[in-house]
């Protein structure tokens, strides 16, 4: 009987994915060869591929092969891992090797002529050891031990520099900081293990690591020319555009990838985040339904559905349901945790939002977004010290991100550091202009309004008006922008213009107490500036307000109480990795006001029309 021919047939059926046929012949070969270890190993492989995990593990462990051969130990542990028996899998990998293992192997070679499995089973020892480290990392991940998981992935990569799965798990899950990524790349023995492909590996690794770098034309080494159109390389470039807030260019690149490969795994999270940032709800709806139909067990499918419900608004309960399903399928899926936090943040549920963001921060140590959102929530709960600390951490990871710069400026404003706030806002504006030469995305409207607020504090009234008018171009029907312009006009003594702007603001939002109060004061001051006799021309200008002169004179006494409280508007904008729709919340803050006579002699001692904070979710 020619067993070698039957063994080749087993491998042939495995290559053709005819696993049942392969299993049948592997079982017969194992019996004919008197259960030689390599035949039992291939029998276990066939059982594993037919999802008979416990049978496969029993075939190896009942014969003690997992204690004698690294390949058998790895396969037995992988069977337990596939059956979600994580602790048993770890026990198999970490079991102590018998002292007489090498003597026994030598005996097998001498007595039975059995060859070294490294050559007979077509696997090198370094490759098997790397696979064991990789599997150990996955098990630690499943057991929520991220530190040991990270260490195991690093070891797997050092043992086998071609083990891209370990590298991808480290980078795509943001398990390393930028400095740690750099140190890892330098520590890899590329010249020792892959002399010929060293340039190729270095290019591919560096290209995937530079997500926070400024996007530039991809420079392909001559030795690997032809990778310009490779989809993984294009996705890495798109990711850099995404993290530098150039969402339109990112969308162009991801659309090209999705056209060539509609379900490209590494492109999907970036593409979904871009659709949210650009508010393409219909496209996201179509994509999410297609993903759920085709890949119901993939967390990115439910992440897409959750993002859609967050984007359309008033569907936060639905969004949480689907995002929770994504985190159940893969509890280390960071983008879903960020979006889950957004679903609470939109309802001003700060504690639940921060809990989700903290979970994301633990999972995504190398990503700045969880830190940004935690800081934002602390800012909204008036804890500026903690907010500043988290913004600083986000800034250390992504120093070029205009969203982070903007939030640091907001904290400086709240601390009364007007010059510092202006610097951060202007830096953020420069970064945005560098992306597209001019500010056109409506998500930057809060930044322009905040520049107007800080310029008003610095008594740069002309510049403040200019910034508020630019904000009106982006979002024309924003009542708070009109009231801010009216306020500046009142400070400049242009009471007629101020009255017009406050009236427009009230037309857009009738319950704006700040505009109601300021309108009354400006009308009174406008009358005071006019002649004692109110002529027909003045009456014509004021008749639209339905106030008689007596009402105007007594307006201060009627509406002064609202000075005690004023409504602040906070605009948050979400997305990650990950982008979700603009969120608006309001809160009231006590404030003491000077007398009417002092109102326009000095800039009001208000805590000011609250700076709008922008929030963007990068989903990857």
Swiss-Prot record:
Name of the protein this chain belongs to: Cell division cycle protein 16 homolog
Domain notes: TPR repeats 1-7 mediate homodimerization, while the C-terminal TPR repeats bind to CDC26, burying its hydrophobic N-terminus.
Cited function: Component of the anaphase promoting complex/cyclosome (APC/C), a cell cycle-regulated E3 ubiquitin ligase that controls progression through mitosis and the G1 phase of the cell cycle. The APC/C complex acts by mediating ubiquitination and subsequent degradation of target proteins: it mainly mediates the formation of 'Lys-11'-linked polyubiquitin chains and, to a lower extent, the formation of 'Lys-48'- and 'Lys-63'-linked polyubiquitin chains. The APC/C complex catalyzes assembly of branched 'Lys-11'-/'Lys-48'-linked branched ubiquitin chains on target proteins.
Modified residues (Phosphoserine): 112, 490, 560, 595
Lineage of source species: Eukaryota, Metazoa, Chordata, Craniata, Vertebrata
GO BP, one annotated term: positive regulation of mitotic metaphase/anaphase transition
Repeat positions for TPR: 4-33, 37-62, 70-93, 128-159, 164-187, 198-222, 232-260, 267-294, 299-329, 334-362, 369-397, 402-434, 442-474, 479-508
Pfam families: ANAPC3, TPR_12
Pathway it works in: Protein modification; protein ubiquitination
